[in-house]
Amino acid sequence: LDSSIYHGNVLYADCFAGIAGDMFLASLIDISVGEEYLRNQFRKIPLENYEVKVSADKRGGIRGLRFDVSSGKGHGHRHLQDIIMIITQSGLSDNVKSRIINIFTLLAEAEAKVHGDPVDHVHFHEVGAVDSVIDIAGAMIMLEHMGWPEVVFFSAQYRFRNIKMRARHTSCTFSGSMRASFRY
């Protein structure tokens, strides 16, 4: 994520090299209050055996932050109800909790549709891992702290064709310009 520009109620994110949860969260830390606030909030989430590292990084001549979560052995495969329980039991604000739960519910509904299973049978692989829970929770924590701006993702440099996204069970291809507005 490069050239994130925050204008009061709108956050513009130029994703010329792509975006991932850890990249988005690192950029929010970089343009906002920093990592100590976030670390204090993470202590409110009942997850164990993980460590967060925020460090300066430079790639392709562009300075930024890197956000890494390392976790010991643990639950990499969780059901939606497991994640809802973790978030519900956290000490995060009700607003942040509901948005995190909404995001995971949307992910579960998408997985259920792809696999033809009921939502309560969906088990997350990648997004059930500790790092994904922390990435999503961290983004919502920081966005709340920033006053819930509208987030506009775009790529000023390229018009993409045949973008491919892959996960453990699925892959998607889509075409068009890379511009999306995100309301959570």
Q: What name fits each language-model region?
A:
Residues 109-126, 130:
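Alpha-helical transmembrane cores and adjacent cytosolic helix/loop segments
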